[in-house]
Design a protein with these regions (language model features):
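Bacterial N-terminal signal peptides that target proteins for export
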Residues: 2-12
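Short, flexible helical or helix-coil boundary motifs
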Residues: 11, 15, 63, 70, ...
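A short alpha-helix capping/helix-coil boundary motif
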Residues: 14, 37-39, 149-150
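C-terminal motif of bacterial Sec signal peptides marking the signal peptidase cleavage site
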Residues: 21-22
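Short, low-complexity N-terminal intrinsically disordered segments enriched in polar/charged residues
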Residues: 25-70, 74, 78-85, 226-229
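Short solvent-exposed beta->alpha transition segments
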Residues: 46, 53, 69-148
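Low-complexity, intrinsically disordered terminal/linker segments enriched in charged
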Residues: 138, 143-177, 181-236
Length: 236
């Protein structure tokens, strides 16, 4: 929590810098040359990039400590939080027919959720989808376990790609005026895009591909990794 406070404090300082810079750019200081304004803008962008790097490192450290999922809420966007809540409800109630119509990354997340639910792997009843995506063997680990390229920052948007193709973003971030937050909702499709190519080559449906990937990952740990996961887990 102390580290989160430090990040917020640094964010406030950067926000103040942005405000002062905008005042200078509005004509309040007409004598400021264009080159000086550009230099000031670049300095702010560099500060925001450093803060983004530190925020991401702190998020990964928080995940590694295995803390409660709600400890990760300050690191993700509000839109991502609502999306995860909705996706958890889908996992609890949506039928095979409806689930099959969803994009691949959501099908994979829902089926993995149902596997965890069936095997009683969840340690909490809150923010379970967030826990699932960020936990060991979760979707986020597909990229965080690989060498990553330098961070890119452009105004209020940030991104991170793989080291071998740093200009192709796989994780997105949003600046919310005081801090950086990970845009999980729009990052997950980018992370799983490479996996989808497997299904295209083999001419599989999204559900067939999801079953294949889950069976490959968990076949030595659990049984019945099959189409039964396309339907909600019985509460009985």
């Amino acid at each position: 929590m102390h580290n989160v406070k430090d990040i917020i404090l640094k964010s406030l300082l950067i926000t103040l810098s942005i405000f002062l810079w905008s005042c200078a750019s509005s004509g309040a200081i007409d004598k400021t040359s264009a080159s000086e304004k550009t230099e000031s803008y670049q300095m702010i962008q560099e500060e925001k990039q450093l803060l983004l790097e530190n925020t991401f490192k702190e998020m990964l450290a928080t995940i590694k400590r295995g803390v409660a999922p709600d400890s990760l809420l300050p690191y993700i966007t509000e839109e991502s939080r609502y999306w995860l809540d909705d996706l958890e409800q889908v996992a609890l109630s949506e039928s095979k027919e409806m689930l099959s119509e969803r994009p691949f990354h959501e099908i994979l997340a829902v089926m993995m959720f149902r596997l965890y639910q069936r095997e009683n792997l969840f340690k909490t009843d809150q923010y379970r989808m967030l826990y699932l995506i960020t936990a060991k063997k979760g979707v986020l680990e597909l990229v965080t376990s690989l060498p990553l390229g330098p961070f890119e920052v452009k105004n209020d948007r940030g991104s991170l790609g793989l080291a071998k193709s740093p200009k192709v973003p796989v994780i997105l971030f949003v600046w919310d005026d005081i801090s950086w937050r990970m845009d999980l909702k729009n990052s997950i499709p980018l992370i799983t895009k490479g996996l989808e190519s497997i299904g295209v080559k083999k001419k599989w449906s999204n559900t067939e591909l999801a079953i294949y990937l889950l069976e490959k990952e968990f076949r030595y740990d659990y049984r019945d990794i099959d189409e039964s996961l396309l339907n909600p887990v019985s509460s009985i």
